[in-house]
Amino acid sequence: MAALPRFGPPVAGGPRPVIAIMGCMVQDIVVKPLSPLVAGGSTMSQIFFAPGGFGPNVAWTAALEGAAVRFVGQAGADTVGGALAESLTEVGIEVAVTQKGTTCCVLVLVSDDGQRTMAYDTSSFSLRADEVTADQLAGVDLLHLYENMFDDITAAGAWKALRVVRAGGGMVSLDVGNIARIQLVGREQFLDRIDQVAPEVLFANEEEAEALWPTGRVRAPGLVVVKHGAWPTTVYASDGEELVTVRVPAVDAVVDTTGAGDAMAGGFLAAWARGCDVNEAVEAGHRTAGAVVSQYGAQLPPTWRGAGDPGPPRHQGDALNAGSS
């Protein structure tokens, strides 16, 4: 079975590798219309608030799966932002955030078949290089990033985090994020950025993979995990060789697909940190994603317990806070 890059010799009962995940605390506003929307009219709907955000979602799932997780990023300098950041500690996540601006809100419109359409405001990830510190990333074994963090506004902070973790001997995983980014940046420039980041593992969905590699020949610095929704997930080697294809277990009902990709990444990363092989890591991601799509909201209940066996984290420490600006 194909192996994932190793964090070091596993020690029974020893400290766990530390996974740092960058992102922005987000308040999701989930809307499930109870009848078809009518232009210019009003529609009775189920509406509720839920924590969200790519990075927090991945961090939450990985922690529930037994990983030692640190969230490094941004929260609004308001009551909601502080509460969202504090909520991550409920599942044992170390929090190292800069609080500034207002909390980012995302409107999530859920259709009858569970598919979601999102609209987000402009209060998203915008960390400068001086807001990302070496202390926040000390002892990190794996850094998980999203491609849009390398946008002009946030590029300096993301590159600094990458350099700090690489200098400490850590590895990197990268999520393509969404098809709109490829269309905005351009295919060749997007591929160049992937090469520059050089992630050990790259996550993409089917649409993103087709946009990046239209000939079907996958090329990347490391492993590439391509998700196909309810269809099997395929993992490719850097030279395009197909390593494994893993079936996605059926769920009783798809309620809301919000956060499915984040949950898959979180489960995968936690399994990787446990020393699992590629097949086992994908299976772990499928399990967590399946649980998320069976409910409303992008984060599982804090009582969820996955396959991980939480032991002492490799690097102990209190929750960090970079201060506000």
Where are these regions (language model features)?
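Conserved N-terminal subdomain of the carbohydrate kinase-like
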Residues: 39-44, 49, 64-147, 309-323
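Hydrophobic beta-strand scaffold residues
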Residues: 69, 95, 172-173, 224
